[in-house]
Amino acid sequence: MPAIVLIGAQWGDEGKGKATDLLGGRVQWVVRYQGGNNAGHTVVLPTGENFALHLIPSGILTPGVTNVIGNGVVVDPGVLLTELRGLEERGVDTERLLISADAHLLMPYHVAIDKVVERYAGSKKIGTTGRGIGPCYQDKIARQGIRVADVLDPTVLAEKIEGALELKNQVLVKIYNRKALEPAEVVENLLEQAEGFKHRIADARLLLNQALERDEIVLLEGSQGTLLDVDHGTYPYVTSSNPTAGGASVGSGIGPTRITTVLGILKAYTTRVGSGPFPTELFDEHGAYLAKTGGEVGVTTGRARRCGWFDAVIARYATRVNGITDYFLTKLDVLSSLETVPICVGYTIDGKRTDEMPMTQSDIARAEPVYEELPGWWEDISGAREFDDLPAKARDYVLRLEELAGAHVSCIGVGPGRDQTIVRRDVLAPS
């Protein structure tokens, strides 16, 4: 069976956890392939139980599914253990969670540097979560990182941490006037934490490819979204990894030819957390309505999300750079009770119309949305389970988004619950 990639098609917070949870009962593996605890997934079970996951794949809530934290993820050991403990206290079986030996560990000095650098940046800050994600990826690229497998050899681990802190302490003390970290203490704390997860360390790329050879289905779950991709996003207001579909192969060890379906997650409107350009952002009562009705508060940061109308320019862009084959449209129910529902179909930049993603940072910062207005609907759609159950105007809205985005809207979320979903096409069915 093929591998399936599930990615956010906007600036994150699109509802990827709901999509993973919906598909989880029919797949054998769920893999998180990038990012760290700087993003969160919210899953609402049919029982009404609400789970917020930051590092562990959403498939952990589905019995029988093996979950993998892939090599592309940066893992904060303390956060991992806290999240595991929280799940276990609520009766969730976590035995089927594995961690790639090649994933990188997020260290205390990464968090310290992240926070102090962002603080000193002042008005030029990019809105980092302050959880050390960027500095950890910097060390990975500089070949100075600590990998999960290193905890299995205390001698190697101590050598690596001592070497890293020779430089990190210079930065913390001499540049930012902060206290130096003691290498022996960092090593001791990490080895103590490792006792809680080292039995989960595995050769993930081997296991995943063997699973595909056995015709098992592997779901590759990204965090954040396309417009936060370090290469394809609104740089520099991006994350430090590749949430796009290309990152799924690199961050899991599964070859690209194994991937046959790319399921993009789109919110029926647009949100963003932190700094950066946002052409359709609303500052009026409509923005307040979307924020309140949609419950737009970050799962990980607790920060209020900026809200705006649906942006078809970035949806079309996401379709292209990810090779999206299908879309899962979430939170359509939030748009009920609006007289009209605008869709951004293009931009004007210095008076010139464009329907494509601007090439430069300065251009997207100056982009003004060009709207097409569709009539709204007043009906409560949270009970709809078939496409024809939706009001005609809601169906028209979905079909117009589908046309503009350039990929089939196969699933539609009409509420937070797992069962509050309309399936127009089965994305797991053989093509």
UniProtKB/Swiss-Prot annotation:
What molecular functions are annotated in GO for this chain? adenylosuccinate synthase activity; GTP binding; magnesium ion binding
Q: Which cofactor does it need?
A: Mg(2+)
CDD domains associated with the record: AdSS
Listed pathway(s): Purine metabolism; AMP biosynthesis via de novo pathway; AMP from IMP: step 1/2
For this protein, the Enzyme Commission number is 6.3.4.4
Binding residues annotated for Mg(2+), in chain numbering: 13, 40
- Enumerate the PROSITE patterns for this protein: ADENYLOSUCCIN_SYN_1, ADENYLOSUCCIN_SYN_2
Question: Where is substrate bound in this sequence?
Answer: 299-305
Q: Which InterPro entries match?
A: Adenylosuccin_syn_GTP-bd, Adenylosuccin_syn_Lys_AS, Adenylosuccinate_synth_dom1, Adenylosuccinate_synth_dom2, Adenylosuccinate_synth_dom3, Adenylosuccinate_synthetase, P-loop_NTPase
Write down the SUPFAM superfamilies for this protein, in alphabetical order. Answer: P-loop containing nucleoside triphosphate hydrolases
From the Swiss-Prot or TrEMBL record, state where the protein is found: Cytoplasm
Q: Which GO terms describe its biological process?
A: 'de novo' AMP biosynthetic process; IMP metabolic process
Residues given in the record as GTP binding sites: 12-18, 40-42, 305, 331-333, 413-415
Sites binding IMP sit at 13-16, 38-41, 129, 143, 224, 239, 303
User: How is the cofactor bound here?
Assistant: Binds 1 Mg(2+) ion per subunit.
Active site annotation, chain numbering: 13, 41
Q: Which reaction does it catalyse?
A: IMP + L-aspartate + GTP = N(6)-(1,2-dicarboxyethyl)-AMP + GDP + phosphate + 2 H(+)
Protein family according to the UniProt entry: Belongs to the adenylosuccinate synthetase family.
Known function: Plays an important role in the de novo pathway of purine nucleotide biosynthesis. Catalyzes the first committed step in the biosynthesis of AMP from IMP.
Under the heading HAMAP family, the entry gives: Adenylosucc_synth (MF_00011)
Q: What is this protein called?
A: Adenylosuccinate synthetase
